[in-house]
UniProtKB/Swiss-Prot annotation:
This is Transcription factor GATA-5. Residues 294-303 have a biased composition (Basic residues). Keywords: Activator, DNA-binding, Metal-binding, Nucleus, Repeat, Transcription, Transcription regulation, Zinc, Zinc-finger. It comes from Bos taurus (Bovine). Residues 72-82, 90-100 have a biased composition (Low complexity). Its main location: nucleus. Gene3D superfamilies: Erythroid Transcription Factor GATA-1, subunit A.
Length: 403
């Protein structure tokens, strides 16, 4: 019982199939040595005590395997316990556990397999690296042109390939040799200088007729004017009204708010140019003025606009106040029997709807009918009417005449 437990290894102990110190030789001094006679009686208990993968470690010995085979024949197919050892003639490992000896068949077979593996490795030396003095096989020229292929297979990789490629006259087929100008185009602005002003940087490089480089300003000036751009900066431009050297071709004036050009391209003043544009004929010299007439524009300030409109409203309110209301004038001009003089008959003014004058809701439109007389009104009769002046009488008559 204790011996069977001693045979079971601990969980952290591994079984060595080819170890000579344990369970193989009785004279090895192993502390767990079991005679072969007791092994068959303990084999039924071994599968329950130790894991499955470690069972072949015990049956690896030839003596134990024979004893286990003899004892396992007692178990039939219907036995609930499986035999602990494999059938005779089969081994748990694909290779033999005996060391290869000089005269053993197993050792000879292993030596032959080892030699074959070494020969197979020698046939493919590329996995171990290529020596410096070696050359590539002939399969590479199939991927290259006829000019480059001989240089790759001519000799070892000692730099001769690079020299042969540099010595090719035309280079690779389908590609032309790079030109120096194209290399300079890859770096725009490098080493360029304007031949006119000497500028080294510009947004756009241009060329003149001879192919020299010009900066953008000089190139545009040369393109527009046909001459080289002057290197001296022009002075500040004078105002348009006092531009030096300009004179109107029509009226010979030198002062204007805007200089124009006629159909011939000659400079003219603003007045002559507008007159020619509107009328199609030159402006007469009699219309020339010493002072420039400016346009009277409306004031932009709102406060000034309100003030001017208020003052104009006050000025226009006075004549409106002097104009009498038709109702008032009609009531004033209405003849009363107390004021009428029998000796001096006056013009009789009849009013329709005079009874509606006192009504505030009555319409304000009144219809008057005049009966003209051949005699003039005496001043004494007109002076008796209170509240009427000379101006009021004239305006009242004008209002009645227009009605």
């Amino acid at each position: 019982m204790y011996q069977s437990l001693a045979l079971a290894p601990s969980p952290g102990q591994t079984a060595y199939a080819d170890s000579g110190a344990f369970l193989h030789t009785p004279g090895a001094g192993s502390p767990v040595f079991v005679p072969p006679a007791r092994v068959p009686s303990m084999l039924p208990y071994l599968p329950a005590c130790e894991p499955g993968p470690q069972a072949p470690a015990i049956t690896a010995h030839p003596g134990w395997a024979q004893a286990a085979a003899a004892d396992s024949s007692a178990f039939g197919s219907g036995s609930p316990h499986a035999p602990a050892a494999p059938p005779p003639g089969t081994t748990a490992f694909p290779f033999a556990h005996s060391s290869p000896g000089p005269g053993g068949g197993t050792g000879t077979r292993d030596n032959g397999a080892f030699q074959g593996a070494m020969l197979a490795r020698e046939q493919y030396p590329a996995a171990l690296g290529r020596p410096v003095s070696s050359s590539y096989p002939t399969a590479y020229p199939a991927y290259m042109s006829a000019e480059v292929a001989p240089s790759w297979t001519s000799g070892p990789l000692d730099g001769s390939v690079l020299h042969s490629l540099q010595g090719l006259p035309a280079g690779l087929p389908g590609r032309r040799a790079p030109f120096a100008a194209e290399l300079l185009e890859e770096f725009p602005g490098e080493g360029r200088e304007c031949v006119n002003c000497g500028a080294l940087s510009t947004p756009l490089w241009r060329r003149d007729g001879t192919g020299h480089y010009l900066c953008n300003a000089c190139g545009l000036y040369h393109k527009m004017n046909g001459v080289n751009r002057p290197l001296v900066r022009p002075q500040k431009r004078l105002s348009s009204s006092r531009r030096a050297g300009l004179c109107c071709t029509n009226c010979h004036t030198t002062t204007t708010t805007l200089w124009r050009r006629n159909v011939d391209g000659e400079p003219v003043c603003n007045a002559c140019g507008l007159y020619m544009k509107l009328h199609g004929v030159p402006r007469p010299l009699a219309m020339k003025k010493e002072s420039i007439q400016t346009r009277k524009r409306k004031p932009k300030n709102i406060a000034k606009t309100k003030g001017s409109s208020g003052s104009s409203g006050h000025t226009t309110a006075s004549p409106q106040a002097s104009v009498p209301d038709p109702e008032v004038s009609a009531a004033t001009l209405k003849p009363e029997p107390s004021l009428a003089s029998p000796s001096c008959p006056g013009p009789s003014v009849t009013s329709q709807g005079s009874a509606q004058v006192d009504d505030p809701l009555a319409p304000s439109h009144l219809e008057f009918k005049f009966e003209p007389e051949d005699f003039a009104l005496p001043s004494a009769a007109l002076g008796q009417q209170a509240g009427l002046g000379g101006a009021l009488r004239q305006e009242a008559w004008c209002a009645l005449a227009l009605a």
